[in-house]
A protein has these predicted regions:
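N-proximal low-complexity "stem/linker" segments adjacent to membrane-targeting elements
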Residues: 1-65
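C-terminal catalytic/acceptor-binding lobe
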Residues: 2-15, 20-21, 178-264
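Conserved acidic residues
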Residues: 60, 88-90, 117
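A short, glycine-/small-residue-rich helix N-cap motif at loop->alpha-helix starts
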Residues: 67-74, 211
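Active-site nucleotide-sugar/metal-binding loop of Leloir-type enzymes
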Residues: 77-89
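Conserved catalytic core of nucleotide-sugar-dependent glycosyltransferases
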Residues: 79, 100-193
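Short beta-strand-to-loop acidic/aromatic patch adjacent to the donor-nucleotide binding site
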Residues: 87-98
Length: 264
């Protein structure tokens, strides 16, 4: 009887290690298929946190690379994968954003704490002089009153190095209309590149408006009170509800020339 009990304990211990992997994070990169070797080196030479591995033990770790989509379309394909496969976090990494070597370590800390649902890295425009893609307000240029190492609260973040919690993207997915993207794939319009043309009835003047999918998404979160309805009531009360961690300082590379910004 004692021997049988001992064997039973061994079996239980062995089976415990074989339980289903947690679908912790999915990394999505929208790309046309060509990336710089500098990007690939930074992406695949990342320091991997313990027990946080694509081949590994208890935490699932997946990658998806939607090819030949427009940016917003690709982002919606990535979100669809995250929703359908039940991932806890989405990490958008664009194919011209070069991560620091410790990026996954930084992300892992936010994932473990789980107290901030939207976290962006810091990177700059591909221009000279360059400006940080950090925003407080609309129509008033960038926000640059920070030093490297600061954690900056903002109301607008880019999607080139962006971590999003499931509570946010799942709620938005559930409430977004379906539409068909390239290759007849049906997704939902969580992200959208705003572009519209209309005629002012008073002046009979034709007007147009356009923007980027990242700021449009940030505006939608605030306009539709997504944070509050997803359970982030304290953050929802903040004027600037999204975090930019400048420790996650990335380079923005020109795929054609290899120039990296900022250049100084």
């Amino acid at each position: 009887m004692t021997k049988s009990k001992a064997n039973e304990n061994i079996i239980i211990e062995r089976n415990y290690s074989k339980k289903a992997l947690r679908n912790r994070i999915i990394i999505g990169t929208a790309t046309l298929g060509i990336v710089r070797v500098e990007w690939a080196q930074a992406r695949y030479a990342q320091v991997i946190p313990c027990n946080w591995s694509s081949a590994g033990a208890n935490i699932g770790f997946c990658h998806t690379y939607p090819l030949n989509y427009l940016v917003a379309e690709a982002q919606n394909v990535i979100i669809q994968s995250a929703v359908e496969q039940d991932y806890e976090w989405v990490f958008f990494l664009e194919d011209d954003v070069i991560l620091p070597a410790n990026a996954f370590l930084i992300l892992n800390e936010y994932m473990k704490k789980g107290d901030i649902p939207v976290v962006s890295g810091l990177y700059y425009l591909k221009s000279q002089p360059s400006e940080p893609l950090v925003y407080r307000g609309r129509g008033n240029s960038c926000y640059d009153k920070f030093k490297l190492g600061d954690k900056v609260w903002v109301d607008g973040v880019p999607t080139g190095c962006l971590l999003i919690h499931r509570s946010i993207f799942k709620l938005m997915w559930d409430e977004s209309p379906e539409y068909t993207v390239s290759m007849q794939k049906v997704v939902r319009k969580v992200f959208e590149t705003p572009a519209r043309v209309w005629t002012d009835p008073e002046t009979n003047t034709q007007l147009c408006a356009a923007g980027t999918s990242d700021l449009f998404w940030c505006d939608r979160i605030m306009r539709e009170k997504v944070l509050e309805r997803a359970g982030w009531k304290k953050l929802a009360k903040q004027r600037y509800p999204f975090l930019v961690d400048t420790n996650l300082f990335c380079r923005h590379i020109d795929i054609n020339t290899g120039l990296q910004y900022p250049m100084k």
